[in-house]
């Protein structure tokens, strides 16, 4: 049986034809790469099937193509679209609250397949987060490509003058970096485009190990990107440029990218505007995606265009600068060739460039390069010898590089020929796919798999629906009348089982539960998720213990956190567990949790920290949590998550209410859960204790389904 490979590409507008590159900040070169990689892999004889999972979008503002649940790409490759969060299109920074729901959907999709993937390849931080969760739950190796890394972006934005607060507000950079750390901790293989990316950018992450990385430079589609002009294509490009340029036959300085801050296009316009020599020799051509009404653009795009328009006006560049409003994706190769025919230069002024696929495309079409001296372009220029690098943060240096690049026609021809030959030799798609498969097969076959993981149900579910009750808060002081009503309602529905959620150990939880006189529970999720048990007698689940114990070093956790005393004090032995280390805080200080997480990352411990009731902190194995225990249970029972109602109340319980299960927040809840009030699958009870549980059961009609 051949390989089944599953790729995760969650944000942007992704389809198999007519990619809307540059339409917004999320639909860029990464989109092209993932599509071409999927097609290239599917064409290999050892690969049977390739699925690219993305988000299903139902939004009148975008094409109905993105609402198609299944799109064949040919040759065994497919796009699979799964719903996640609101139906409307969302930029990637707004997707974070819904990624647990996507992880649930991907897990269910894989569990329903006759064959599970040989590996999951996650692209970018959001998919890395989802991929890490699915990999943990199903025991499938994870391959990760960050494409653009949060720590590097944060560094560049800080250098550009933005504050930490501004960066966080615009880019949700903290969640992105945390997601990248989590993906790196789980990955069997990290695909990078260059040595610099591995040695300098990924190396800033605590969870990254150098031996995880393999440098596999992307390839170029030689069928599209080549130096030979196709009949009629030049006139099409001229029609795009004609409204803007007085002397359209001048040598162009061309850039093709998205209108986002990182691409640094205003700096290129200013360098051009400051140089009479550049204006005499060249036109400036900016292909920045397709745009319609500026009022409908995202703020970042709108700001970039505003800066460009102001610079054109300030330097009086009318007739010298082209910025076409619309173009078709299939015109991009023709635009490169049109520029090459006029002895043009392709310019990449980006502040940071993990690789630079457009540099390869331009070179394949015979266009020399002037590029940022950051990341991938260094490797490309070293291999291709077809242009020069420049410090794009220094306008004088950028201006000088552009002036020198167009000064010598013989050198231009040498650069052109070098680029065409080097791309053919070093950057073919066949070579990329062969190298990719070799690295992934070797790393993923050696990846440590759990001794036992659930992919299909191992037993028939004992119930059709499951109510999970918080034992520590929701029923702590329940009135007898409310408990009696709840008891009667639950006993009347044999298809609905109950389970207990608690930070206590089994002995303590059993004593507390006995006081409630409720029907016996089918399941116990205890010690904050580190202990999973079944039935009234509390039979331990050995598969869960095996799953979470991998890589767990309880003694090392205690040693690492000793340095935080007296901020943290170990709780008494009766509150500890084999897979749970519990502390009490000296004071409920906001920064302690992040301090603990940072220490665990720095020491590369496979552990996670949670704060409860503002005073208590638990450290568990990386794979252990109440939310993960619920999903392990549902996979084993074959119970759909939307048939599970989770009652939550405590600080740190937000993760219980993410994803596909139904959520009920008790009236006595911690204020940190108020952020979930707009979630469609989260109901906030207004009545106390057992009455609130009954209120939630009625809201969802949970006992009458």
Explain the meaning of each model-derived region.
Residues 482-573:
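Active-site phosphate-binding/coordination module
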Residues 1-360, 364-448:
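Catalytic cores of nucleotide-sugar-dependent glycosyltransferases that transfer UDP/GDP/TDP-activated
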Residues 122, 144, 192-193, 371, ...:
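Short beta-strand scaffold positions
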């Amino acid at each position: 049986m051949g390989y089944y490979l599953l790729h995760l590409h969650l944000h942007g507008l992704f389809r198999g034809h007519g990619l809307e590159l540059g339409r917004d900040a999320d639909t860029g070169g990464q989109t092209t790469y993932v599509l071409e990689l999927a097609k290239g892999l599917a064409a290999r004889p050892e690969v049977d099937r390739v699925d690219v999972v993305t988000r299903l979008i139902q939004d009148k503002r975008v094409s109905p193509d993105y609402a198609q649940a299944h799109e064949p790409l040919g040759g065994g490759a497919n796009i699979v679209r799964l719903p996640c969060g609101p139906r409307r299109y969302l930029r990637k920074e707004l997707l974070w609250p819904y990624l647990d729901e996507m992880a649930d959907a991907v897990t269910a999709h894989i569990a329903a397949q006759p064959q599970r993937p040989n590996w999951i390849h996650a692209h970018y931080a959001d998919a890395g987060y989802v991929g890490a969760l699915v990999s943990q739950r199903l025991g499938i190796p994870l391959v990760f490509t960050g494409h653009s890394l949060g720590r590097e972006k944060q560094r560049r934005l800080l250098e550009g003058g933005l504050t930490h607060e501004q960066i966080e507000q615009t880019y949700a950079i903290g969640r992105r970096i945390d997601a990248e750390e989590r993906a790196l901790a789980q990955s069997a293989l990290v695909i990078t485009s260059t040595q610099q990316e591995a040695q300098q950018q990924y190396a800033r992450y605590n969870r990254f190990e150098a031996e995880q990385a393999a440098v596999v430079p992307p390839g170029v589609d030689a069928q599209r990107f080549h130096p030979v002009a196709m009949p009629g294509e030049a006139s099409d490009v001229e029609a795009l440029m004609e409204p803007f340029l007085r002397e359209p036959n001048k040598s162009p300085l061309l850039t093709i990218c998205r209108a986002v801050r990182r691409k640094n296009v205003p700096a290129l316009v200013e360098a051009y505007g400051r140089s009479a020599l550049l204006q005499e020799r060249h036109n400036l051509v900016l292909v920045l995606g397709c745009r319609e009404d500026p009022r409908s653009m995202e703020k970042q795009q709108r700001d970039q265009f505003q800066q460009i328009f102001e610079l054109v006006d300030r330097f009086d560049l009318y007739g010298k600068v082209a910025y076409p409003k619309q173009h078709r994706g299939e015109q991009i190769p023709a635009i490169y060739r049109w520029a090459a025919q006029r002895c043009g230069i392709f310019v990449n002024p980006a502040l940071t460039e993990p690789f630079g696929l457009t540099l390869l495309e331009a070179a394949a079409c015979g266009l020399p390069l002037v590029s940022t001296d950051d990341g991938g372009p260094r490797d490309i220029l070293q291999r291709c010898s077809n242009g020069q690098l420049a410090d794009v943060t220094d306008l004088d240096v950028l201006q000088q590089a552009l002036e020198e690049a167009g000064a010598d026609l013989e050198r231009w021809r040498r650069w052109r020929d070098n680029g065409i030959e080097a791309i053919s030799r070093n950057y073919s798609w066949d070579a990329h796919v062969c190298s990719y498969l070799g690295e992934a097969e070797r790393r993923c076959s050696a990846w440590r798999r759990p001794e036992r993981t659930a992919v299909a149900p191992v037993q028939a579910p004992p119930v059709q629906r499951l109510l999970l009750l918080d034992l520590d808060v929701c029923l702590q002081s329940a009135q007898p009348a409310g408990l009696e009503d709840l008891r009667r309602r639950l006993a009347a529905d044999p298809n609905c089982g109950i389970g207990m959620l608690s930070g206590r150990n089994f002995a303590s939880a059993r004593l507390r539960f006995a006081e409630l006189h409720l029907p016996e529970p089918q399941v116990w999720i205890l010690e904050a998720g580190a202990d999973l048990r079944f039935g009234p007698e509390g039979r331990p689940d050995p598969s869960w213990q095996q799953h979470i114990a991998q890589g767990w070093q309880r003694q090392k956790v205690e040693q690492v956190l000793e340095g935080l005393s007296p901020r943290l004090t170990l709780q008494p032995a009766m509150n500890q567990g084999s897979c749970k280390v519990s502390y009490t805080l000296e004071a409920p200080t906001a920064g302690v949790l992040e301090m603990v997480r940072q220490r665990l990352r720095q020491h590369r411990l496979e552990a996670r920290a949670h704060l409860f009731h503002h005073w208590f902190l638990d450290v568990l194995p990386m794979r252990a949590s109440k939310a993960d225990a619920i999903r392990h249970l549902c996979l084993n029972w074959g119970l759909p998550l939307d048939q599970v109602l989770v009652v939550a109340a405590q600080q740190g319980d937000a993760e219980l209410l993410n994803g596909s299960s139904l959520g009920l927040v008790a009236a006595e809840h911690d204020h940190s859960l108020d952020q979930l009030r707009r979630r469609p699958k989260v109901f906030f009870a207004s009545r106390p204790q057992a009455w609130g549980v009954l209120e939630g059961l009625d809201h969802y009609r949970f006992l009458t389904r």
